[in-house]
């Protein structure tokens, strides 16, 4: 893994300022927001930024399974939570319940999907991380 990817994998949560008053009233598309700068690190309470359910893939990390980092409001392919959970999500949630970080607002075992050009879906399972950085198991 390149050094930059290693640094990004272990970086603290990202904290972005609120949208300006002149921004459109519709929810912002994470793929249209600029990537955060190196100086934008979280210095705000966790409750101010709950764990997002939408964000962009930043890179893949090698391992026994592909892993990705989900950064909200950054450009890239968007992942979203489906309305219904994956059939295996309940068993995975039970298996990973103890892995939840103390004080994390996120719950383990949530199922995400990534839309592909071929109209097929790739399931990704949420693993809890600090509020604005989510690790997904694909």
From Swiss-Prot:
Disulfide bonds: none annotated. Residues 22-55, 81-107 are annotated as: Disordered. Residues 22-37 have a biased composition (Pro residues). Transmembrane segments: none annotated. It comes from the Eukaryota. This is Proline-rich protein 34. It comes from Homo sapiens. The lineage of its organism: Eukaryota, Metazoa, Chordata, Craniata, Vertebrata.
